[in-house]
């Protein structure tokens, strides 16, 4: 199958939901060819787990419901638990968002599902799985997609057994691997070597769901599809770049898992570094998967390993005046080891040592139990030279808000309306909910799973890209693991440690605190 376009064409007249998906189906290899192509079997490894229940099955249902999958697609769940399809359906129902009018379609979806129980390290279990797949329509000719919704501790056994017992005989086989892709550079390289000994790179889909988000995918179009940004997207005009990921909740019972990884491994080394590479990379020769990923690797190679002096680490503590979970600090979570020094907040400053970005700080900020839910890219531009307005002008900023409420807006100066002759801050605003009211933005997993069906790897992580990401962070992570520095406490629901604000101010980010956003829908 060919590569699909990453976005549906938008006409001047808003499209209905059915029209949107009709347009998308046309882009999937001219609709008919894609939908009536070979039989596909999608196998969910770890079908009894939370990821499968909350994300994978719902995503497959939405794609099936909207007619975006090939017509002859079947689904097989595999896990150690003794389950039935009815049991899986019952556990998934709260997350499927199925309406009463979709009941018949939902029944058809689950009629395409089957389930096999087995052990991940047991060859006989996978031989049995293969026998079951061969009984489905398409038999040995069906294409197979394996989604590893599993802990990384079983990747080795599962992938080896897939290779030896479950590869499609006459169709293609693709394997989707969830993060974490290792714990540091060495473990990541070992995993990559293991996978490459079993599969070719075009069979491996390392999924970072952030690469499926609307505004992350929009970064390339915004940069390379608009003439106005090219001349200013460099060190001559950009003072600094801030990449932010904030969550308003803590670990809430997931402390055991989180404590093994921490916020840097969980968010910064993958999600935020992916954003950085899309902001900083050079223009690719085309939008082909390898051309795009080649440029991302090139820019990552220009970043030196992070040093501790460019990092602030924090850990949230309870707010005595808060409500519910806000009263509890990280160490109050019963699943967290006593006295843990794991970071729930981090700010780091990176520099891209190339002609375009030399000297421009890239500030990565992420944390849990903060004052809001927000993920965004913010380019702050340099001051206007030769100021004639008596220091009343603030720096321009271009902001790409990834979540919530996708938007692109530019902070700029304009004359204050009325008899005044002085500048004030305002914005050029493209809020998606206002501009594209009738467009259903697909979930990140919908986009990415559809990409796997189509064979597009643009929004998946390649092995050399992964290697460079770990090279940048591993020395810092090893130092933190060895020295266990005490993280700076910050109150649940706050902005994070004040020391982080001091760091970003020191490297050149300017926070004026004077800007007031006005919702255009409430004027």
Predicted feature residues:
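Secretory/organelle targeting and membrane-embedding segments
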Residues: 2-177, 181-523
